Amino acid sequence: MNHHHYSLVIFHLILFLSLDFPTLSHRFSPPLQNLTLYGDAFFRDRTISLTQQQPCFPSVTTPPSKPSSSGIGRALYVYPIKFLEPSTNTTASFSCRFSFSIIASPSCPFGDGFAFLITSNADSFVFSNGFLGLPNPDDSFIAVEFDTRFDPVHGDINDNHVGIDVSSIFSVSSVDAISKGFDLKSGKKMMAWIEYSDVLKLIRVWVGYSRVKPTSPVLSTQIDLSGKVKEYMHVGFSASNAGIGSALHIVERWKFRTFGSHSDAIQEEEEEKDEECLVCSGEVSENPKEIHRKGFNFRVTVVGLKIPVWSLLPGLAAIVILVAFIVFSLICGKKRISEEADSNSGLVRMPGRLSLAEIKSATSGFNENAIVGQGASATVYRGSIPSIGSVAVKRFDREHWPQCNRNPFTTEFTTMTGYLRHKNLVQFQGWCSEGTETALVFEYLPNGSLSEFLHKKPSSDPSEEIIVLSWKQRVNIILGVASALTYLHEECERQIIHRDVKTCNIMLDAEFNAKLGDFGLAEIYEHSALLAGRAATLPAGTMGYLAPEYVYTGVPSEKTDVYSFGVVVLEVCTGRRPVGDDGAVLVDLMWSHWETGKVLDGADIMLREEFDAEEMERVLMVGMVCAHPDSEKRPRVKDAVRIIRGEAPLPVLPARRPLLRIRPANEAEEMIVDGLVGEDLPWMTPKSHFS
């Protein structure tokens, strides 16, 4: 391995800002402001440029000369920040936002890009070929890269993407920028938001052209940083121009904040007015170093780098006194390319295979106390895997496979690994198949299933309070499920029919966002495939959610999922089960209310009428039209969403409950069934189909 030695000049800029900040306490004097610039980084027009422009195509008449710059630049906050409490192995959550732009040099291709960086070693660099100026893999670091150079050898998906790196230049996950609505090479100023929640073990990244944070993140990755960070880490930015590429990587407005381990979620900061400060703190202290070292509850803000020239004069004087030439050597070689790294490169982090020992360790040997759910073919355990974090382990029971007429493990595994990446779908994290044991590992969602919230019985303990989902939360849940189904039906490469949409399979995250799971019954079709050409299957699913035509023909379709979605909508609005303990059918009950002009009588009494009546009626009507007995009258889920949001007219419902019409595929006659009640369970799966 060849070793290369480089020297860097480190400029310690201490900027004494004598500005008045009305938003801060009058008892508080702004501490000494301090950034450290490395390599090519420099102040430029009230911003920081991490790199310098350099010639890409030197004249053939000009003799080659020694490069004037390393092509690498960094800007780090001078004080290390506490990220880990060693006694409890608790990691701080954090959030930051900053504006940036990447401007290519004339007649030059773009450089490597830049990264938001958290590193244990401020002086560690990988010099060979740039690599965004990231640290040596031997050091602990986390980086969110904004990459503009395509390097397929190291897992890049293209030359315009955002990725998350953890102590490696191989991204654990990445996403194409163009597909998410922004272009890193546009030269325009953009905003980025990065958040890590230690409770959720989740990193999320948002990017947009507006200062308003987008609704959905462009990248979301489940990862536990407790084993990835040191007690104190340095925070800032890093960039590089490698080879013939050259660009200015400019960072302007930057805010950074950490949160204690007790914080359940990242709290949105209000826009502050102290635009002129370089580094300022929201806490009162006479000792500036104390602000940045005292633990989890400190706050560091790096805001607008719009610094008047006169305010730099004291800092320039300090630079003349403090500048020192620090020569150091770094031993670095080629990137370590292991088989594991190769297997994890690509567009997204592919779920990895886990050993049975890891699964047993995660679940304490499949401890009964860790069980959080149980179905016909599998038991779900809560667990923890160091490389992933909190997980839900779905352990399959082979004894029940013959009853399912298929291998549910294989069905769900192939569906999840091949297609599904959506914010409203439970994310697949790994799998195990060893001996007679098979298991799938998913993200753990702390609030459990939607069914538990809708139908939880009062506790005998008077001190235990039942959480009632608000109307706003319920509408958001319905829209989340609709988004997931739209993705499955219309946006995936191949159409996926879930076949088991029900509240038990809708999970809720810490913020009560819906995530659809359990793809053990899913069917996959080409979008161009005709319904008539699909083979009939033995109807499978859950009584109360199955479309009538599916029960009688055995052919699943997008509209059979729509029917199930309609029942879910009614269940969420009313708080009633699809089939009550007394045999009452929810769909029938809602038609009875509709026929008497009292559809709002179906609203959940637990809401105590704390809802918008017009919106409630609109959503109930959507549920009824989606659960229409005639599949041709059901809307697409996407169209149902437009009605719920008031963007489309209300559906037209008949004055009386329509008759159920079944058209057998090979028979001329049609079957007409009037709406019955009680034991016959109209529009439901016949009892003979299920035990």
UniProtKB/Swiss-Prot annotation:
Pfam families: Lectin_legB, PK_Tyr_Ser-Thr. ATP binds at residues 372-380, 394. Keywords: ATP-binding, Cell membrane, Glycoprotein, Kinase, Lectin, Membrane, Nucleotide-binding, Plant defense, Receptor, Serine/threonine-protein kinase, Signal, Transferase, Transmembrane, Transmembrane helix. Coiled coil: none annotated. It catalyses: L-seryl-[protein] + ATP = O-phospho-L-seryl-[protein] + ADP + H(+); L-threonyl-[protein] + ATP = O-phospho-L-threonyl-[protein] + ADP + H(+). The active site is at 500 (proton acceptor). SMART domains: S_TKc. Its EC number is 2.7.11.1. Residues 27-257 are annotated as: Legume-lectin like. The keyword rRNA-binding does not apply. It is an enzyme of class 2 (transferase). It is a single-pass type I membrane protein. Residues 1-25 form the signal peptide. PROSITE patterns: LECTIN_LEGUME_BETA (PS00307), PROTEIN_KINASE_ATP (PS00107), PROTEIN_KINASE_DOM (PS50011), PROTEIN_KINASE_ST (PS00108). Glycans are attached at residues 34, 89. Disruption phenotype: Increased susceptibility to the oomycetes Phytophthora brassicae and Phytophthora capsici and to the bacteria Pseudomonas syringae, characterized by stronger necrotic symptoms. In the C-terminal section; belongs to the protein kinase superfamily. Ser/Thr protein kinase family. This is L-type lectin-domain containing receptor kinase S.6. It comes from Arabidopsis thaliana. The gene is LECRKS6.
